Structure formats: C-alpha cells, structure tokens
C-alpha cells in the first residue's frame, strides 16, 4: 500500500526546517604578503561585512593567521587555515596542531585538498584523522573530495567520492558530519578554468548528501556542501542557485577583491535552502 503524508504532517516538517546560511571560503593557497594581505582585507572588510545570510571565510597560510585575527576579529568575516596536523602535540617538526589554530582565533580549516593530497601523499586515513582533530578542537572542517578527469570519464566518480567519505564514516560514524563542511572539488576543474556544469555539480552534491542521509539524516541536514573548482563571477550565480550547493571554496578569484566580492554577492543573492 502506498503511504501518504497528511497536510498537517507536511506543515510540521516545513516548520521544523530552517534556512541554511550560504558559505563562501577564500583559499589563498601559498600567496600573499603582509602588505598585499592588508590591502585585500581592507576591501573585504568594506565590501563583505554586511551580508544577512552568507558567511565569508578567509583561509590563509599559517604565517598570516595572526594578521587575519587582528584585522577580522571586529568584522563578520571568519578565518581559518589550509591544513592541520593529525597529531595533538609532540616532536613533529613543521606541523601545526588544531589547538594552535584555535589560539589564533581560527574557526575553520581546509582538510584533504587535492593539491596537498597529491604533493604530500596524504592518504584518506590521514585525512580522516585530521578531520576528527578539527572537530575535537572546535574547528569546522572543510573536507575536500573529488575525482580526476580519468575517473569521471570512466563513470566511477561516485565510487571515488564514496570511498573518500567512507574512510571517515567507518572510523568515526556519520554523525561527525553534523555542522561540518564538504567541498566537492573535481580535481580536473581546480585551477584549469574548467568548471563542472550545474548538472554535474547538482548530481554529485545530491549523491553526497544522500550518502550521509542514508546513515544519519540529521547530520546530512546540518552538513554544508560547497562547490570548488574554477568558480568565477561569471558562473557563481548559476552554481549558487543549484539545490544542495551551499556556497563555494574559491581559489584564484579570492586573490582579487572585485572578483571575490562578486562571487560572495552571487551567493547572497541566490535562493536559500531549507533543511
């Protein structure tokens, strides 16, 4: 027998939903200087501090975290790092722990970006440990997942992303994704000028949310899923309007105040999701 949901139950479900704030994250990568950063932050503070339903975050190299804390602590712009150690403390030369990031006021940290995974041979297991370290110390992890062009052309992109998620789920459970962020970044789109089509992005974002929801629906509803990979002022509005795209992780364009501002305004102007 086919079950139907009464109008009263539907109304109750709608009342329980809430609007989901958009999230736009600047990933400065290994760029910047004290002077360049100050000029860029001046414009960010002027242009991006008054949004009503978009949170802007700047993730900078470690040496500039104190500068971000000093410049942004009186604004509505949050800040974070681009990596975190998997260890709490100890003889790990060159590493920076989650607790240290908190000392500099960080509230976000990027984890598992494909550039790091490739250049420094970061395994899914190590990325999962870093994810948990971030959560343990009150940082919001921005977990990067995505497939190569070869994997997409072979039609195994969902299998690849599923494996990346399962490493965390199998170790820590799906509940850890509550109030976390996943950034879907097709590796073939990062820094290439090629972006996933809205349909490609929508399909993968829906797959990711359904994957988490099949285990823990509350975590799936609280999870934000960003798109990253050649987001620019020309495609931002179209991408941000897609269901299940909660914002973007922005690389190159975040180094240009006009371009990054245009992307943030596109997020602010896009329809809110309710979950």
Each language-model region and where it sits:
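Active-site loop-to-helix "anion-binding N-cap" substructures in soluble metabolic enzymes
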Residues: 2-183, 187-275
